[in-house]
């Protein structure tokens, strides 16, 4: 089951992101503070021990004219990318936020080598479409 990060759980969340191998500054609350036109939200999933085992911070921005929002999880999620259950729970949380904020799309760009076909197959199984190739910025972030 996922949960939304609150002021009460923010320090624990930040410690998790900083210590996880897939953690990235773009998943930090502090990164969200640098983007005043965006709303920062984070989702977490806990293990049986009660500790955070996966998270996804998303930035939400209202798009002019269309009255909808764009949801972007820059360099997220932060979790074991082979853990289908955790990924699915994080995505369920993102979908709930997308509904609340009337998002027309959820974009993520985890730090995953382009050779990791297993992860890209996992993304497709959850309905994501990935941009192939591009060592520049064709796919939001470069892929190597």
Located regions from the model:
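Acyltransferase donor/substrate-recognition loop-hinge adjacent to the catalytic core
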Residues: 1-10, 124-144
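Short amphipathic alpha-helix that is part of the acyltransferase structural core
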Residues: 1-29
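Short glycine-/small-residue-rich flexible loop motifs, especially phosphate/cofactor-binding loops
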Residues: 14, 95, 120
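Short, charged/polar "capping" segments at the starts of alpha-helices
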Residues: 112-119
């Amino acid at each position: 089951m996922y949960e939304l990060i609150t002021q009460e759980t923010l320090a624990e969340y930040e410690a998790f992101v900083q210590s996880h191998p897939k953690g990235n500054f773009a998943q930090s609350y502090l990164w969200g503070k640098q983007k005043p036109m965006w709303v920062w939200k984070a989702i977490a999933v806990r293990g049986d021990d009660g500790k955070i085992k996966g998270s996804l911070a998303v930035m939400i921005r209202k798009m002019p004219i269309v009255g909808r929002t764009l949801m972007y999880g820059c360099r997220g999620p932060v979790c074991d990318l082979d853990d289908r259950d955790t990924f699915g729970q994080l995505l369920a949380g993102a979908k709930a936020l997308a509904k609340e904020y009337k998002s027309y799309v959820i974009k993520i760009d985890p730090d995953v080598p382009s050779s990791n076909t297993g992860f890209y197959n996992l993304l497709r199984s959850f309905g994501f479409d990935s941009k192939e190739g591009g060592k520049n910025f064709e796919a939001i972030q470069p892929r190597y």
